Amino acid sequence: MSGDAAAEQAAEYVPEKVKKAEKKLEENPYDLDAWSILIREAQNQPIDKARKTYERLVAQFPSSGRFWKLYIEAEIKAKNYDKVEKLFQRCLMKVLHIDLWKCYLSYVRETKGKLPSYKEKMAQAYDFALDKIGMEIMSYQIWVDYINFLKGVEAVGSYAENQRITAVRRVYQRGCVNPMINIEQLWRDYNKYEEGINIHLAKKMIEDRSRDYMNARRVAKEYETVMKGLDRNAPSVPPQNTPQEAQQVDMWKKYIQWEKSNPLRTEDQTLITKRVMFAYEQCLLVLGHHPDIWYEAAQYLEQSSKLLAEKGDMNNAKLFSDEAANIYERAISTLLKKNMLLYFAYADYEESRMKYEKVHSIYNRLLAIEDIDPTLVYIQYMKFARRAEGIKSGRMIFKKAREDARTRHHVYVTAALMEYYCSKDKSVAFKIFELGLKKYGDIPEYVLAYIDYLSHLNEDNNTRVLFERVLTSGSLPPEKSGEIWARFLAFESNIGDLASILKVEKRRFTAFREEYEGKETALLVDRYKFMDLYPCSASELKALGYKDVSRAKLAAIIPDPVVAPSIVPVLKDEVDRKPEYPKPDTQQMIPFQPRHLAPPGLHPVPGGVFPVPPAAVVLMKLLPPPICFQGPFVQVDELMEIFRRCKIPNTVEEAVRIITGGAPELAVEGNGPVESSAVLTKAVKRPNEDSDEDEEKGAVVPPVHDIYRARQQKRIR
């Protein structure tokens, strides 16, 4: 029993690094470093134990061909072929990854070889693969493997032989016009194949295909260039907003744009669309969490569908139209289940195709997700219902929205304005606003929307009554009423007399006495400002302690990528405009206090030594320590003096003259000039040299084994 317990405990043992990885994944399910640890651990475990990890992996990254391949290879290794085929059924059609498809072909080749129908199944597998992944730039090996497979098929009789030749030729001809790496080699193999069958017929066959091949070869080079730098094995993760990610997104979009530019210069719109959609599919394997890629892919299919319909190709037009809907469906069913943007675009697309029932199902599907804010969904749903089925249908959606506890005040504003603009009945809109005020009277945004509506109707008395009700009812907390008071003051400034303006100002100051104590003048600014015009300069506003409540709030709610309006007005005075120059970071500076007689190897200024770069640190660790070098040591001063006095010749003739001590003598022998064997009678002396000084300092003696001089001596003997 103790042995069994120990074995069970050992089986349940979890390494510390795996525990840390699991903890990281709880914080961030897309942490690739943590997943790498789990993958390595799973690869060292039996498949029955590792299968759970692999399932989690492909569930988290359903578009990663690399992870699917790891899972499948683990099952193949364990000879679980029934599970392998189910895995291929789950991923093969959705993940057009070249390595995954090569794995599929290898699996069919190795496991179906003994079946009687092996040849038919293998040929079908190759045709299926080339149809789906044949446009891949790295698909050369699949084409070659298919051709070699067909060549190896046994053919008995002339009819079977002709069939085999036709099949091989068909694959060669398809491949030679398909842009990919190594297309030149495929073309050379095709030429040899045709010449081996019939050398007389080969010339015509090759000439017929030569033009298309040259076009494909040109495109293949462009294809290779545009694909360079793309990280095609990266798993799809939510946008990280890093420079590296932005660069990859830009490169993917350039590749897609290149395919849209029709580099093959074909008039076949179907072929162009297929190539562009293949580019989108490759992009979505990596950028599947980016909604813009899904939307642009669907838009392109919709445009292609309309173009083909105009040309009369109704079958392909309908095919592409349905495929556009399928793109939206895939997006909201897999990686972007909560992305409202794609739901709304999908609904609008189906609305354009007059499929209203489908639109209802799309909106209801989104509303069924519990952990979302359904307010915007109801708003768009109401607008669709009003457009497609009339105002009564819109009211039914509004009723449904009111019953949903998750809904916020925006739905009431939308419903009221829809009634006002569409049914032209301001009394119904008024009732909806009043109904919403009972529920959302403590939300200043709702109150302001109601005020805007009444101002639009130019009903001064009702507007003033609403201000008084909201500000005196106590439903709105004082800290939230700042913008309401500012709007009340603006309202009185536009239509009231001076007495009413002063009265509102006084009441406002009383409400915010603690905040504006000693800053009464700051409140005066709101009386005279208009839109972005202010009665003081920016520096004066700052000195007054003025805060623009509306603009501060606007800046807070606008997302970071959008540039929010400045809280202070744009200044017109040139005096206040100060030029912005790049300035050094003075916080990082250190005082210049050099050491006296600094030891060798130390920086003269304390703290002035910068850390060695990481690459140099690695190199320094690999090098032996300084004590290992005992010499010889170079006399740097003397070496530099030799370089300084060395005269470098500008021409070959001058170099020969310096070496030989005179001009080269040429003798014509046979068919060309041959250098004469002039004997050097004295040592070569450099110009501008003083022999006496050299003797005093010690002449530079040439090395004993000077190969160059030895060769020169052999030449002149």
UniProtKB/Swiss-Prot annotation:
It is found in: Nucleus. GO terms for biological process: co-transcriptional mRNA 3'-end processing, cleavage and polyadenylation pathway. Residues 683-704 are annotated as: Disordered. HAT repeats lie at residues 45-77, 79-110, 117-152, 163-196, 221-261, 271-303, 319-352, 354-387, 458-494. It comes from the Eukaryota. One of the multiple factors required for polyadenylation and 3'-end cleavage of mammalian pre-mRNAs. This is Cleavage stimulation factor subunit 3. The lineage of its organism: Eukaryota, Metazoa, Chordata, Craniata, Vertebrata.
